Amino acid sequence: GGDSRYDADYPSISYLSAISRVAGAERQIYAANANDFIYTTDGGGRDHGFLHLEATIKSTENPRRLKPINVYYHMYAGEKTAQLEAVRYHLDAARQALVTPVAASHYAAIADGFFATQISSLGELTWLVRNRGALQTVRFDDVADLSVDFARSVGVIGQQRKGSSLYVALDEARADVIVALSPDTPSAGTPAPYLIDGRWTFRDLRRRDCGFSVMARGYGTGQMNWGGLRPGSYQVTAFDDQDQSWEETAD
């Protein structure tokens, strides 16, 4: 359900669905975007119609992120060349984009967490976040001059700025977290390692005087960028679930 579109045929934000709908005692989480069937049977009968998903993805990303990316297709798309090529186009784009692939069930859990989360103020620019479930990101708008104060925050893994908005990544390993912000100045404090972006999900970040450790999992190559590191050489060691290790030195 949902069938969100925001393109030349549906040129309004009003065509974007809500996160969910309440059905009796249950909550139905909508798919983020319309599926291939909607695009190929919208009146034009266009076999290439699913390509127009790209317009919705771009329109809901800028100037403000409104929806996640959702490549929702059916196996019968393989029956026609144009439909199959459209699916391949979006999957290839997703592999190259700076996104974090998650299972559909994980997205539904994140959406459920949105409705359960409780945020309370602990003072100036400081908040306690509780009962968030699988929701691990919060966004602050119109804070171009603020950043995370990692010295006062608890359970915060990272931050990333998008325009005047600040996205803050929370640690799944902590039930309750504290998010503190402070003016973004060169002398804001001692650097602390933090996640900028990554194609995997991360949890249980433990910062130490000479480094840090974190658990990660996901799909595909584990590409990631970290900030807050002092200049110098770092020994990077990775262990899989079989305790097999990989080591590399990075500057």
Report residues per predicted region.
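Catalytic domains of cell-wall/extracellular-matrix polysaccharide-remodeling enzymes
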Residues: 1-28, 84
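A structural signal for short secondary-structure junctions
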Residues: 22, 30-32, 50-53, 61-67, ...
